[in-house]
Each structure stands twice: as structure tokens, then as C-alpha cells.
Amino acid sequence: MSYPQAPSKFVNPDEIIPLSPPTKPPFAQYAASPLPATPHTPYSPPSPSRLSETIPLRPYLSLLPRILLTFFSPCLLPMILTIAHLIQNRSSTASLATSLKSSVLSACSGLAKAAASIKTLPRYLAMQTNQEAIRATQASILAIGTMLMDAITIIEAVVNFIVDTYRSLLLCTIELAVRGTLEILISAVQTISDAVTDTLNSVRSNIQDDIGDANDIIQTAVSAINRVTTLVNLNISVPEFSIPALSFLQNVTIPTTFEDGLITLNSSLPTLTDLKKKMDEIIDTPFEALISEINSTRLEMAASFNSSILSVPSLSSLSANSANDLSNDLCSDLDTSLIDDTAKALHKLSSIAIGLMFLLLFLIWAALAVWEWRKWKLMKDTVDAVNEEWDRDGKSDAWRMVAIVEHPVLERYSGTFLGKIAKMPRTRTNLRWFLSYLAHPTCLALLFISLFGFLSIQFQLVALNALKAHAQSSANSTVTASTNSLVTKLNAAALNSSQEYADSYNEAIAGYQDRINNELFGSWVNTTAVTLNSTLVEFYDEVEKALNASFGGTILYNPINTFMYCILGSKITNLEKGLTWISEHAFVDLPTFPSDILLLSNDSMNEIATPIAAAAVGSGDGGDDDDGVVGTLISHFESALKVERTFYGIMLGVWLALFLIGLAVVIWNSGGREKFMALRGVPSSSSPPGYGPPESKHPRWKAWLTNNHPIYDSYAEKQFRGTTPTNCLESYTHADVPNVNNGNDDHEKSFFKMRDSHAAGPFGSHATSAVRSTIASLAAPGQSFLKLSGRKLTDTTTPYDDKVPLAPVQTSEKYSRDHANSPFPRPSSESSESSAAQPFWVDKFYGAFEGVKSFFPTRSQRLGAALARKASQRTEGSFGASQVPTARTPGHDWIGGHQCLPEKKAEPEWSMVDPRMLGRALEDDKGRYPRVLPPSEMAAANYNPHPVYPRPMSRASTLGEGMVIPSTTSHPDPFQDMPPLPPKHKRASMDYVEEYESSHSRSSREDSRHGGVTSPASSSVSYFAAEPQLVSASKVQVGVAQKGGQATRALAEIVKELQEKRERKDPFGDDYERGL
């Protein structure tokens, strides 16, 4: 069977120093010799003086150029551009303030020119006012005359009605009183006469009837008496009274002289028809004359009131002040301080913003310089770690190297964070991709440009809003004072003309007012009131004469006279009082003009001065150009800031879109794809490579990582756990040399392609070494990503996958490593990782839960603490042969275990030492490899027991057994590269969780608990920190070379010596003790 050769390295013969050959695999880390160590001359690299006097340039940037380039970092460029914009806005604001002040003064000058025109306004206003006043006055005179004529006509009708009413009332009253009285008297006289006659006749009849009745009564009584007396025969007779005639009472009457007088008076009463005609003539004559006089007077007065009697201001008064003088008067003390104050406030705001931006620029630059220094340091440590790994292990994943070098800070600090929030390796890998995506220079530049720019502009806008409110309030008060002053000056310019015009107009109106009072109301009062009064007096006199003629000398004269005064006389008296009041109040007052008739009102003047106020603070009507000079000044500054804010906001939105795209990709690859496929009914085989179940045709476990690993020691850990062999070892006549994975597969997720979870443990280093600590911390994410499983996260095979058989063997693990193709199950948590991924937030929850659990001691830590408390310091004797990490044969690892093993030829063994001890003289006389003695000889040699590391519940890598190392006859030259063996330890794998940190701290605690001396096969980071007193050798099989190849002479002697040791009895076994 042929073995592929590793690519040969070019070795310059001039650089080879005798006795110090370059390190060659596989003997760089493995050596075996029974002889004492041979002193070596330390190999020293050429001193810098041999190379060159000057340090040449490298194909990469060192620290100083990187710090120099931070001045133009994408984080600083937006701030520099923002500062430039602020400086430009500040200069443009100052120039705009000067321009706006000029515009306000120009507006005031224009108003002054308009005010000069306003001074000419009173003449033209007076002319127009005169025309309207003449028209109104003429109409008023005519209307007053017409009103007076109508009033007089109405009064005439009313007087006639009143006079006729009282005349008719008087006549009717006389008819009612006199004729009624007379009729009553005549009727009474006749009734009395008839009553007297009837009464006397009735008396006569009654007397006669009474005498007749008396006679009858007497006769009746006598008759009754006689009937009684007839008994005695006695009759009484009484004589009757005679009835008188009484004829003188029958024709008695009253004399008719009085009655005849009353009848004559009733027929002789007057009708007052002549009085009515006379009164109508007396009333109508004066009223008709008054109406005619008023009509002629009103027409003459209306015609005489024209424009000739009203004056107007002359144009000569305008030459006193020119327009320029008026402009100086109006605009000389115009307050424009509000513009200056606003400009100064904006300038101060810009200066403060620029200063803060410069300060922030310096702070960010300092932070970037520190960041670049830290990044450079981490990058150097990473490069050193990668070089060391590559020198020891060969090439690995170059793309992983790119990720580490691009983002060394993320590699250093993201492991703990991602390990706490994500439980599954796939989720951690996706989140690591997301962080790299966000940390890309383009994405970072976009974020910093948009964020810094947006925040700086927004802070300025907030300060500008407060400044705008203060400027507006100050501008309003200033403009109000300026407007009041301007209105006062404009009114003072037109006050004289208005006063002259008002005086001339009022004089003309006063003359016509006198004419109206004297000619219209005077004639009416003098004529109508006096005439009417005399008419009423004459009317009353005529009525009294008629009553005197009719009732004079009678008993009715006084009642009738009193009644007439009550009915008519009192009314005439009240009418005379009314006429007297009219005479006293019959005049008119025509309205006159005030002295400011030609001046504009305050509202009008404010309206004229509004343009200046609008130019200063805006009109306030909500238009586009109503902000005024102050608003324009602030709006100019604000608009520039808003344009920049919009630009930065768009850039921030683009970054958010990129953020969401990256987040969607992470969610899709963290379980979203599986859910989508499940919803569509797609089989699970459509899962991404490396995350689905293992396929049988491509084994996922490397054969050389299992039972036939050349460095695989499961002895001590099996004995500590108390397990027994589950199967018998089989003899293998050959073993393949493990290959070096060059990492060409694009689907590989790990930086170092670990073929075994034991080999993926963190490599020990000195605790005081910052470089080694950094290397280990950078390598920790890869270790955690593989979860110490040793699986390759891809289904593609390497050139050796199909050539190396899989065989179940005993290991230090509790379960078989052949999970894919072995009948032995592996019910560990790692097998669940190949199932369908949990959702991202579920993983995040479990990750947080695991992070909390990490603060508490683990089970292994508690057990170790219990061992430290309850047991003394363990030695080789206390642990027994099964706990001593010494060289053992497979057949003697277990008591009785060799009975189930097939017989096979004993094979030699050889020791593995630390490669760092090469070329170092050992202090012990026993040499590099002390011989293992029986207990009796150890006691005789003053052997002191020493503490060893029992590795409780350890998951660290151990040395396997059972794989044959073939001899390589194809490389007779010892200086030529040999096919490499897999290293005993893998240094700090690169992944993103805290497994390395926890294992590092746990190993440190265990080392301190056990004295600091551990097995070289353990994962303790402090192994090389102390010189062990006993170097235990792990067993490997050094078999016969394949295809008849011959090993070197030195190798043959080593094999022979190891074979002799193998044939010895176990000095720590029961058989050996019985033999003693």
C-alpha cells in the first residue's frame, strides 16, 4: 500500500547548522532512546545584524501606517464633511444676515416714498370729500324742508281734527245735557199731573168703597145678633151710613205754565254750524302760508350750498420736505438689532457645534488609534499562532485565516458572548458570519457616516428650534415698537393739512346751520305757533259766547260753562304749552369734521406699516414667504441642516436595510430553511451540508481518529470511570499514515481541521505568557464550534476517507466514536446536533441558560473538590497500577482483560516527549527517559511518591493505542520531510464559545489541587509550566514497514529496546508480586 508524500519543503544548505538539524516530522515530537540525552547545540536564528542594516518594507502595513491612515478612517470622514458643512453654513449665514438687513432698510425706504405720497393725499381726499359733503348737505336741506312741509300738513290736519272733535263734542254734549234735561222736566211735569189726578180719584173711590164696606159689616153683625135674640124675640136695627159723592176730587189738575216754558227752551237750542265754518277758515290760512314759505326756502338754501364755499389743501405745502428727508426721518432710528442678534446666535451655535465636532473628532481618532493598536497586536498574535499551528500541523483552512485576520478583535472577544446566547454550533457560526457582515468596512463606514452625521445634525436642529422661538419673540416686540413709531411719524406729516381743511368745512356748515334754524324753523315757529295759539284762543272765546247766549240766565249756565272748560279749555291750555316748547326747541345742529378727518386710522396705518413688519418677522398668514428676514435667516440655516439630515437618514436607512438582509440570511440559515422545507414537504435531505444526518457512503468519523490512532491512551480514564472493555481488540497488520487536510473544501467550518475531539483540546501554555494566552483565546472558538466532537462539518471526503477502515475499539470515551457506522450507539448530546436545528430564539434561550449555569461549579469540579477534601494527596501507590500514566501494554490494561485478547506478537514501545525540551540538557542524572522500576527498587532508591493528575471526568485528549506506524523506506534522507503524524495536542481551536476559557480555568484549578504535575497526555495548560519527575510514555505501535520497507538503523535499535521492555512482566501487576 502506497502512502502519499507530504510536499517537500525547500531547505537552504547554507542555513543548516551541524548538530542542530531542522525539525522533521514524525520525530519532531516523538523520540525514544534508552540512552542519556545527547547534548545539542541550541539552534539560533541569524542575528538581525547579518540580514541588513535597514529594516525592509513588508507586503503588509505595520502599526504606524495604520495609525496614520486612521485620520481618514470612514468613521472620521463623515465628521470632517459635517464640520466643513457647518463652516460653510456659518459663513453663508453671516452674509445672508447682511443681505437681509439691507432688505429691511430698503423696505423702509420704499415706505418713506409711499409716505411722501401720503402727504399729498389730504388735498385729493378733501376735494372728494367736499363733493360728497355738498351732495349730502343739499340732500339733507331738501329732505328737511320736505319733512317740515309734511309735518305742517300733518299738524294742520291734526289741529282741524282736534278742533272739529271738540266742536262736535261740545255740540253733542249740549244736545245731551240741555235737551235731555228739558225732556226729563217736561215728562216729569206731565207724570206728576197725571199722578195727582189719578191719586185723588183713587182716594175718592176708596173712601166711597170703605163707607160701603163698613155698612155691610155692621149689617152682618146686626143680623148675627138678631139670630141670637130671636130666641128671645128680640130684633135690633142699626141705621146705614150715607156714601158721599166727592166730585171735587175727580177733576183736580196741575198748571202747564212751567211745562210750556221747558218745551219752548228745547225747541230754541243752537246747532254751532257757523262756528265750525269760522274755525276751519282760521286754522287753514296760516298752515298753507307756512308750507309755501318752507318750500321756497329749502330750494334756495340747497342751491346756494356748493363747492365754492368749501376749501381744499394746497400743493405748496408739499415742497417743505422732500422724499429723502422723509425717508431719513422714518428710517433713521429703525431697529434692526434683531437681525444682528439672530445672526450672532446662529454664529455662536455653529461655533459651538464645530468645536464639539472637533473635540468628538479627536476623541474618536484617539479611540480609533487605540483600536488600531489593539487590532494590530491581536493580529500579530493571531499570525504568530497561525504560523505556529501551520509549522506543527501543516496547512489548514485559508478562508478561516482570512476571517481571523480581517476581524481579530471579534475573534478575541466574541467567543464568550456568542457562547452564552447560542447553544448550537451552526447558530454560533451564523452569528459569527453576521458580525463579520456588520464589521465589514463598507457596512461600518455606512453606519458611522449616517449615525454620526444624523445625530450631529439632529442636535443642531433641537438647539435651533429653541433659538428660533427666542428670536421670534424678540423680533415681535422690536417690530411692534418700530411700527408704532412709524405710524406716529406718518400721522404727524399729514396733521396740518387735515386741520386746515376741517376748520374751513366746519365754518361753511355753521353758516348754513344758522340759515336753517332762522329761515326754516324760525318762520315756522314764528308763524305757526303764534297763529295757532291765537286761533285756539279765538275759538274758545266764540264757544263761550255761544254758551252765554244759550244758557245765560238759566240754571244750566254754570254747569255748562264748567263742563266746557273741562272738555275744551284744558286741552287748549296744554296745546298752547306744546306750541311754546316747539318754539323754544325748533333748531338743527349739522355735523362738523374733526381735525384728523384726513388722517388715517390706527388700523390703516398699521396696515401700511405691515410690509416692514412682514419683512422683519413675517406676515403670519401661513404662506411660503411669510417668515420675514428673521425666519428667512433661520430657515436658511435650518434648510441646510435638514437637507443634510435627510441625506444621512437615507444612508442610515440603507444600513438598516443591509442589517435586515443580513438578519434574514442568519434566520434563514439558523432554522428558517428547515421550517420552510418542512412546510413545503421537502425531505430532510435538502438540509445544508454538514447539518443533516450522516450518510453511510461517506463516513463522518475519520478512521485514524478512532481505535487505530497511533497516540491513543485510554487506559487511565477507563479505569477511573470504572468501565470494562466492551469488545476485544483485534490485531491490525498495518495502519495508514494520517494525512494533512489542506482545507481546500469550501464547506469546512473550522479553522484547524481537527480529526479527533481529543486532539482538539486546548494546548497548554504558560499562564504568564500573554501571547500564548491570546493565541489560545483566538483558537477557542474553533474548539467550541466542533464541540470537541472531531466531526468534519461536510459530507465531502478526503483522499484517505475511503481507504482507512472503521473498526470499533476501546477508547477513553464512554461511547464509541464510530457513531455513523458502528453498532455501538452514542447517546450523547452531540448526536442531537445533527438533527434539525432549533429556532434561533430557542437556541438563544438555552444559550443564556447555559451561560447562567457556567457561574456555578460543574460536576467534575465538585468531585475534584471532594477528592481534595476527603483524600490525601494521591500517589502512584494509592491509585494503583491502573491510575499511573505509564507505558502499559494493551493486554495488561485490565485485570483479566488479556484473556479475551487474541494472541499476537509483542510490539515494541517508545516514549513521547515535549518538543520544547529538544536541545535542552536535563538536570537529572537519569537522563531524559528514566527507567521504570518495581516498587521495591523504587523504595530502595529513595523514591518519593509524587502527586499525579487523575483526570476526573475529563474530556481531554488522551493517547490512543493499537495503530502501527509503518517504516518509511522512501525517505532515506533524514533531512528530507517525512509524512507527518497527527500531533499529540492541537492548539486552541478557533470557535466562538467559552469552552477554552472554562477548560483553562478548570485545568488550572485541578493543577493547583494536584501539585502541578500532570500526565503529558492530559489537557492541562500548566503541564509544561513544571518539570515532571516522571515522564510517562504513551504507547504506540511501531510495527513492520509496509511492503517490506526497512527503517533506519536508529529506529531499529529503538524498536528492539521497546520490544524487550514489552516482554517484561508488569512490575505493578499481581503476577509480578506473586513472582516476587
Swiss-Prot record:
- Gene Ontology cellular component? mating projection tip; plasma membrane
Q: What is its main location?
A: membrane
Q: Does the keyword Kinase apply?
A: no
Region annotated Disordered sits at: 1-31, 796-834, 874-899, 963-1020, 1057-1076
Quick check: keyword Membrane in the entry? yes
The topology of this chain with respect to the membrane is:
Multi-pass membrane protein
Cytoplasmic-side segments? 88-138, 372-432, 668-1076
Read off the InterPro entries from this record: PRM1
Superkingdom field: Eukaryota
The portions of this protein that span the membrane are 67-87, 139-159, 351-371, 433-455, 647-667
Specify the glycosylation sites in chain numbering: N235, N251, N266, N295, N306, N476, N496, N526, N533, N548, N602
According to UniProt, the name of this protein is Plasma membrane fusion protein PRM1
Organism (species): Cryptococcus neoformans var. neoformans serotype D (strain JEC21 / ATCC MYA-565) (Filobasidiella neoformans)
